[in-house]
Each structure stands twice: as C-alpha cells, then as structure tokens.
C-alpha cells in the first residue's frame, strides 16, 4: 500500500463494550476498519478477538444474556449497526462471515451458494446460476466444481469446503467480510490458497480477520490490532506492528515472550 494513499474509513467501533452476562469481555474498544484493506486481529486466546469480530454481524444476538454498549458505525450511511432499531438480518447481508472450520450446509454445492440469494428473494433460475458461478469463480473454486454442482458439499475436501463457504459469503455481495481463523483447520497448501484468495478479495471487499498465526497476520494484512484482556493494546500499520511496535506488550507477544 502506498504511503501517499490515505485509506477510506469503512467502519468504526466507538467505545465498544460487550458483556457475556455479567462478564465484561470487551472494554472500550475504538478501532477503525479501512475500506478495501485487510485488518488482522491478534492476541492470546481469550483476549476478545473473536468476540469483537462477531459484534460486527450481530452474532451475539443469538444468545440471551449478551449485550453491547457503544457503537459500530458502518459507512457511507454512518448507521450504528448495534442499534436495536437495526435488523440484524440486514446487518448480516452487509457483513458476511467465514468461520474457523468449514461449515457447508447439508445441501448441494449449488444450493450452498444459492442459499443467501434465495433469502434475499432471488428465485429466477438464470439469475441464481449466474450469481452462483460468479461467487464460485471469485472464490477460486469454480473450475474444480463446475461439473459437479449437484454433488453434496460434504464430498469436497476441507480446503474446497472452506472456499465454498467463502463463495457462499460472497454471493450476497457484502460490504465487509469477517474471517474467524479461516485456515486453522486446513493444511499448508489449502492455507496458502485461502491467503492468496484474500489478497485478491481485498480489491473489492473490506476484510477483518482473526488469526493466532503471527506469520499469517504479517503476510496478509494491511493493518493489525493487538488485543489483550478485552482491550486494544496497539493498532497500526502491520509493518510497524511487526517491526517497531510502540507498546512493549505488543513486542513481547509477537516475539513469543507471552501468549
């Protein structure tokens, strides 16, 4: 990324707190998310990375006792997506998610990708076929599955299943894509394929990724946030975070002194 090009703000958390019942898991997190860039969230287990990520598409709404305090604004309209007046289904149409382990539906390859389109009210077969092909192509798996779209998704390899899940997320044309440790269950070759795919996707989408893999964060991201005990310790350009961090705790974590 050229230093002369100022990134555009796509979303922003503002003094975000999150509670699992009485437990305060996130503490006053204010963090920018830049448009068409990859932002990595790093930190030890239990630091709040995935909790923070799941705030962006209101996944916590699915469980009673969880509550938010603060805002996440989504541009260009500046809407606070955590507002109870905002439909979480609409949020999930704008912000899609790919999980740690591939989670294809017990349906055909075609229907896995078409699912979100049908939810959006698209039923015309020719439109579905066009958009499914586009999503599978953008997820770099079309050539591997184009002759077996009626096969069950479970018949695919782990790496193929994860790319199928990415295609499913892409099909609804989201503004932001969330990746929660998307390669932790994959072998090195499949991991490299997903990382290469993310580099291509950021040309059109804004990406937030949670990873425990420091090398992966350094390879794929433009910006990195280090979280610890529910707080942001440091946020900066990824190169600076990994070479000359401002906070000693960041350096200690990256170099393996704790974590």
Curated annotation (Swiss-Prot):
A Pfam family assignment: ABC_tran
Residue sites binding ATP per the record: 43-50
Enzyme class: translocase
Keywords: ATP-binding, Cell inner membrane, Cell membrane, Membrane, Nucleotide-binding, Phosphate transport, Translocase, Transport
Cellular localization per UniProt: Cell inner membrane
Catalysis performed (reactions): phosphate(out) + ATP + H2O = ADP + 2 phosphate(in) + H(+)
SUPFAM superfamilies: P-loop containing nucleoside triphosphate hydrolases (SSF52540)
InterPro entries: AAA+_ATPase, ABC_transporter-like_ATP-bd, ABC_transporter-like_CS, P-loop_NTPase, PstB-like
Gene Ontology MF annotations: ATP binding; ATP hydrolysis activity; ATPase-coupled phosphate ion transmembrane transporter activity
Keyword Oxidoreductase (UniProt): no
Entry's family note: Belongs to the ABC transporter superfamily. Phosphate importer (TC 3.A.1.7) family.
Stored PANTHER family: ABC TRANSPORTER I FAMILY MEMBER 17
Function: Part of the ABC transporter complex PstSACB involved in phosphate import. Responsible for energy coupling to the transport system.
Subunit structure: The complex is composed of two ATP-binding proteins (PstB), two transmembrane proteins (PstC and PstA) and a solute-binding protein (PstS).
UniProt protein name: Phosphate import ATP-binding protein PstB
């Amino acid at each position: 990324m050229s230093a002369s090009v100022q990134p555009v703000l796509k979303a922003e958390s503002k003094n975000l707190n999150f509670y699992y019942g009485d437990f305060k898991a996130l503490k006053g997190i204010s963090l920018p998310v830049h448009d068409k860039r990859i932002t990595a969230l790093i930190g030890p287990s239990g630091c709040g990375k995935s909790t923070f990520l799941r705030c962006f598409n209101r996944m916590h709404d699915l469980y009673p006792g969880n509550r938010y305090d603060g805002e996440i604004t989504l541009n260009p309209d500046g809407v606070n997506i955590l507002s109870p007046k905002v439909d979480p289904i609409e949020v999930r149409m704008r912000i899609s998610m790919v999980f740690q382990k591939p989670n294809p539906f017990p349906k055909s390859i075609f229907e896995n990708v078409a699912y979100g389109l049908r939810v959006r009210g698209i039923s015309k077969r020719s439109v579905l076929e066009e958009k499914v092909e586009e999503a599978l192509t953008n997820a770099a798996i079309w050539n591997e599955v184009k002759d077996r779209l009626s096969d069950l998704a479970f018949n695919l390899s782990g790496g193929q299943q994860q790319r199928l899940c990415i295609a499913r997320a892409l099909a609804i044309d989201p503004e932001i894509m969330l990746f929660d440790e998307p390669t932790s269950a994959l072998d090195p070759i499949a991991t490299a394929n997903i990382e290469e795919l993310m580099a291509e996707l950021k040309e059109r989408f804004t990406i937030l990724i949670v990873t425990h893999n420091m090398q992966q964060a350094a390879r794929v991201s433009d910006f990195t946030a280090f979280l610890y005990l529910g707080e942001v310790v440091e946020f900066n350009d990824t190169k600076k975070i990994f070479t000359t961090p401002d906070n000693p705790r960041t350096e200690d974590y990256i170099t393996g002194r704790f974590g």
